[in-house]
Amino acid sequence: MEELEKTQKFQKKKKQQQEKQDQSSPINFEMSSRSSLHSLPQTTIESPPDSPTLSSIPDSHGSSPHTIIPTPSVAKTETPFRVTNGEEEKKVSESRRQLRPSFSSSSSTPRESKWASLIRKALLGFRVIAFVSCLVSFSVMVSDRDKGWAHDSFYNYKEFRFCLAANVIGFVYSGFMICDLVYLLSTSIRRSRHNLRHFLEFGLDQMLAYLLASASTSASIRVDDWQSNWGADKFPDLARASVALSYVSFVAFAFCSLASGYALCALRSI
């Protein structure tokens, strides 16, 4: 009897243990599943810019702690950009640095090159006229010595000496400028607009034009005064011829100064 009671108690204990194990098994399974979910690596899914993004928030009904619901997203705007190579950047920088248009032979139009060539030839013609008139003027003035019944000479009057000196200076300057223009026309070289050539040429042409004008005026006044005092003679006639040629030199230098002034104002190489 005692053994039967012991066996019955033992069987009851086994049944109780089995029931406890059966009750604890679903809890352990749920805990293990939760731990496995947390241990998995989190992966992010990139959504297109127009589709709504997804965010995880806990469900209010408590069905699962990781319920995924859509949320609206803000569209991203990208600023457009342009890829340029090094050559284009250099061209852009050079065009920004360049403040004045270039008047080189490659960029000039046929009309501009023809106009520049015409001005060169006209300037050369005026230089030749000034050169010849100055040469003849001071030659006639130098030859006016011991002429007429009075045997008077030009070096006795400062007005005639002044006219002689002005024509000599104009003769030398015109000779140098003629050589320069002939060289430019023969080699077809355009002058640089960055040097002081145009400023010097315009300034010297103006100075010589005013110098010849004042010298010719003073010499002509002296000739009229001599003739009013002593009458007509060979000496004042030669002096008058020299003064007339000096006026021609003044007109030639005036036109040369106009051409050089155009080159200075237009900043072109002629």
UniProtKB/Swiss-Prot annotation:
Q: Which InterPro entries match?
A: CASP_dom
Query: Where is composition skewed (Low complexity) in this entry?
Result: 100-110
Q: How is this protein positioned relative to the membrane?
A: Multi-pass membrane protein
Kindly list the residue ranges recorded as spanning the membrane: 122-142, 162-182, 199-221, 247-267
Residue intervals on the Cytoplasmic side: 1-121, 183-198, 268-270
What keywords would UniProt list here? Cell membrane, Membrane, Transmembrane, Transmembrane helix
- Here the disulfide bonds are none
Topology feature Extracellular, residues: 143-161, 222-246
Cite the residue spans of the region called Disordered.
1-110
User: What are the subcellular locations of this protein?
Assistant: Cell membrane
Q: Mark out the compositionally biased spans (Basic and acidic residues).
A: 85-97
Query: Would you tell me the Gene Ontology cellular component terms?
Result: plasma membrane
Q: Where is the composition biased (Polar residues)?
A: 24-66
Q: How does it assemble?
A: Homodimer and heterodimers.
- What does the similarity note say? Belongs to the Casparian strip membrane proteins (CASP) family.
Name-wise, this protein is CASP-like protein 4A1
- Which species is listed as the source? Arabidopsis thaliana (Mouse-ear cress)
